[in-house]
Amino acid sequence: MTGTLAGKTAIVTGAASGIGEAIAKLYHAEGAQVLAVDLAEPGLPADARMALLAMDVTAGDAPDAIIAAAQAAFGGLDILVNNAGICLPGSIEDQSLESWDRVFEVNVRALFRITQAAVPLMKAKGWGRILNLGSIMSDFGGPSLCAYGASKHAVAGFTKSLAVDLGAYGITANYLQPSAIWTGMSKPFMEDPDFRAYWEGKAPAGYIGEPEDVAAPALFLASDAARFVSGMGFRICGGAMARF
């Protein structure tokens, strides 16, 4: 098999739809062996290079189970994409502690635990790529995004620290920062015509991005070509955040 990721094994969480599904499909098309993970088994076509796993990333045994599944299917691990995430909107006055904790449990704690389980395999190879899903909210705030915004700031800080800790082992760590993208998670927001008009107007590109627009830079960051790129956030926003 030829392709940018030929011979590499990738784990992609949150792979049943949206950005995670687009990344899993593109990695597979570019030659990678992919373990696609989601709460319900992803509907991707399983084959010799695509394995599917139904797993709650917050479960106590999730990190070990996910790593074991990748090893059983493909014999190792090279690339980890921590894409699984949730958004439970709420301002400081109405965000419940339960919803705050749940956002951090999925968006930060699970990401940390799975990464912790994956790193030894990458260290043993002397090569690895860790790609976390941040957001433009990793740098900014937004209305009623108290918990979500804080969790994505945490993803940015965690990823930068990973880059410092792991660079000597041939492992890079970066995070993607999409703005509004057409996904299942964004659907409740996209149904608001004012929200949609805001992002279409803010982006010089004049439209809202698709999951495939996020998958393309995710491919580069997982490749050998990105060996000197680490600790960075990549904004995928159609130029929206360049506008004053």
Where are these regions (language model features)?
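A conserved structural motif in NAD(P)-dependent oxidoreductases
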Residues: 203-214
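Short C-terminal tail/terminal secondary-structure segment
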Residues: 140, 219, 230-244
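Alpha-helical segment proximal to the catalytic Tyr-Lys
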Residues: 120, 164-165, 227
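Short, small/polar-rich loop/turn modules that mediate ligand/substrate recognition or access, typified
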Residues: 81, 167, 172, 229-231
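Residue(s) in the substrate-gating loop at a strand-loop-helix junction
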Residues: 135
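Substrate-binding pocket helix/loop in short-chain dehydrogenase/reductase
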Residues: 91-92, 99-104, 195, 199
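Active-site helix of classical SDR
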Residues: 115, 151, 159
